Amino acid sequence: MPAARVEYIAPWWVVWLHSVPHLGLRLQRVDSTFSPGDETYQESLLFLGVLAAIGLGLNLIFLTVYLVCTCCCRRDHTVQTKQQESCCVTWTAVVAGLLCCAAVGVGFYGNSETNDGMHQLIYSLDNANHTFSGMDELVSANTQRMKVDLEQHLARLSEIIAARGDYIQTLKFMQQMAGNVVSQLSGLPVWREVTTQLTKLSHQTAYVEYYRWLSYLLLFILDLVICLVTCLGLARRSKCLLASMLCCGILTLILSWASLAADAAAAVGTSDFCMAPDIYILNNTGSQINSEVTRYYLHCSQSLISPFQQSLTTFQRSLTTMQIQVGGLLQFAVPLFPTAEKDLLGIQLLLNNSEISLHQLTAMLDCRGLHKDYLDALTGICYDGIEGLLFLGLFSLLAALAFSTLTCAGPRAWKYFINRDRDYDDIDDDDPFNPQARRIAAHNPTRGQLHSFCSYSSGLGSQCSLQPPSQTISNAPVSEYMNQAILFGGNPRYENVPLIGRGSPPPTYSPSMRPTYMSVADEHLRHYEFPS
């Protein structure tokens, strides 16, 4: 046996959780000894759930106050303020996403650790149950051999060798030895009730653990989906998606606090058991198994003497005595009574099988096998199980913090979306630099192309007369130039009216540029048609 398995030592987190003050619902101090049937002890575990409920209430109150203050606060939305709000919302979403991913990672580890611990507990319970069942089967089989099978052989031999009184005395002595074996076997504990309870406990533990593991797995997936979809709503500026996911985030926040309450109560209660498991087992098995036997299996120290040693020794001596008697009858009685050989060989085979069963029973009754299962069960529940519960509690706290952060970022993002839409609505639809107008123009093929100040129609006029006019400043109104633009085939909304209004002269060309300009104008005339 490995040295680490010789003695159970409670880990530090068990000692720390056991030292947590146990208070009832009326704030009275409660004994921390593990007693799940005691109402006051149940109230002390329920009080931990009440603390988690208070934390949830304070969290919701804080979020409500924050939402009200954010929605009612009016601020001047300058360009710098909008940039700051956008940056704040972005970084808040990033931090919340990182917290959510970290929480799910911690939760996966804690869920796996708890599941491993529970499976180790179930495996140890099944092994112990198999050992107890094997003990009962061996005791029952040996009792059957001694009381039924051996009696039948002895009865037939008594009829065969009835003429010899000394042989009859040998048979009676063997019958007495068989009675001693049955008496010693009846003194061994019957584990039937223990195996029934262990089977029930194993099945209940497996059932609860499966749905616990599955519930946390679904909660992890829900947290990730809500966090990712909320970040997607922020990125796409979808108010509907953001609002629905924030509502789901509040639900997940409630589930996180509820899981924290369950984890805290389970961790503290299990730590109370793991602090002194021997005492609890001794107090609850006294009516079924002798306390000396229970203590022998729980402690399994070299200083303890096996309570079954005397019974097993008597069993072994009785079998040895009967084998000697059968050997003498085979040697001396068979020559006189040949028909007795079959029954004597049957008794010899029966005694050999009983001796094999005795060795198996001795190995099963030894404390080392069951004590190892006991230590494995404690390791699974007190080390891996409680450690996983602590990580699950940390997951609940991180998830609550992450979704609280997302909920705080929601109203700011909502106001930012509304202000952005309002700024778009304030822009004139006829403004060519309006992004909405540009999108409409891009999807409307019937709308004419945008012409510059030097349009193709003005180029045609320049071809007819290339002499630069006198550079005079015109004081004509803007509408006159707009009408001129219409006559030349342009769009008055897209002409550079301020340039005309300043009285800027048209472009002039030197004699060297005239052939180049005329060739360009001819090429433009081939691609565009103008009204006559």
Curated annotation (Swiss-Prot):
Entry membrane topology: Multi-pass membrane protein
Positions annotated with a glycan in the UniProt record: N129, N283, N352
Cysteine disulfide partners in this protein: C274-C382, C300-C367
Residue ranges that the UniProt entry lists as topological domain Cytoplasmic: 66-87, 235-240, 407-532
Positions carrying Phosphoserine: S504
Motif annotated as RGD, chain positions: 164-166
Compartments where located: Cell membrane
Record keywords, A-Z: Calcium, Cell membrane, Chloride, Chloride channel, Disulfide bond, Glycoprotein, Ion channel, Ion transport, Membrane, Phosphoprotein, Transmembrane, Transmembrane helix, Transport, Ubl conjugation
Reactions catalysed, as given in the entry: chloride(in) = chloride(out); L-glutamate(out) = L-glutamate(in)
Posttranslational mods: Ubiquitinated by NEDD4L, leading to its proteasomal degradation.
Protein role: Calcium-independent, swelling-dependent volume-regulated anion channel (VRAC-swell) which plays a pivotal role in the process of regulatory volume decrease (RVD) in the brain through the efflux of anions like chloride and organic osmolytes like glutamate. Probable large-conductance Ca(2+)-activated chloride channel.
Assembly and oligomerization: Forms cis-homodimers in the presence of Ca(+2) and forms monomers and trans-dimers in the absence of Ca(2+). Interacts with NEDD4L.
Protein name: Protein tweety homolog 2
The organism of origin for this protein: Mus musculus (Mouse)
